[in-house]
C-alpha cells in the first residue's frame, strides 16, 4: 500500500471455496486511509456470477466497512480450477455529508474530470473436493487442530 491510497483492502485477492451447486462468499474489508469521506464502487468482469453487497458506498474518515462478494452456485468446475474473473474497486473523495444515495451518476466517471483511484483484485478458487474416503479424516484432523489451538 502506498501512502497516497485513499483506501486499502484486505485480503488483496478474493478466495472462494468452490463447490458445485453451492453458493459461497468472501468478505473484503475496505479501510479509509484518509481524513476525507471516500466513496467506493465495485465492478467485476462477470456480473452475472457474483452478488456484491454493498457494491457502492461511502466510508467515513479512518473508518472501514465490509463488502460481501457472493459467488453464485455453479453447475460445472472451471477448467483446472482457474478463474480469470477480476474485480475493480474504484474510490474517490466526496464531500462530508454525502450519502450513498446522493452520489451523482458520474461520480466514478473519469471523463467527468473526477480523480478516481482503482484497485484490481484477482479471484482464486479453492477446491473443497477431496479424494474418496478421505473427507472424514480431513474433517477430524482440521477440527482437531482447531481444538488444540484454542487452549
How should these model regions be labeled?
Residues 1-27, 31-37, 53, 57-60, ...:
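Intrinsically disordered, low-complexity regulatory regions in eukaryotic proteins
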Residues 44-56:
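Short, solvent-exposed loop/linker segments at beta-strand-coil boundaries, enriched for Pro/Gly
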Residues 37-45:
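Short, basic/aromatic beta-hairpin or loop at an interaction surface
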Amino acid at each position: 500500500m502506498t501512502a497516497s491510497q485513499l483506501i486499502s483492502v484486505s485480503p488483496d485477492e478474493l478466495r472462494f471455496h468452490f463447490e458445485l451447486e453451492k453458493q459461497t462468499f468472501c468478505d473484503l474489508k475496505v479501510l479509509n486511509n484518509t481524513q476525507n469521506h471516500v466513496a467506493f464502487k465495485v465492478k467485476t468482469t462477470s456480473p452475472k456470477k457474483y452478488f456484491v453487497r454493498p457494491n457502492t458506498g461511502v466510508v467515513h474518515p479512518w473508518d472501514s466497512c465490509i463488502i460481501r462478494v457472493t459467488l453464485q452456485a455453479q453447475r460445472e468446475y472451471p477448467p483446472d480450477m482457474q478463474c480469470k474473473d477480476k474485480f475493480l474497486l474504484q474510490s474517490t473523495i466526496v464531500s462530508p455529508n454525502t450519502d450513498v444515495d446522493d452520489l451523482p451518476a458520474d461520480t466514478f466517471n473519469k471523463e467527468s474530470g473526477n480523480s478516481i483511484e482503482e484497485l484490481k483484485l484477482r479471484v482464486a478458487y479453492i477446491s473443497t473436493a477431496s479424494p474418496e474416503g478421505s473427507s472424514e479424516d480431513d474433517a477430524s484432523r482440521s477440527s482437531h487442530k482447531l481444538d488444540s489451538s484454542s487452549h
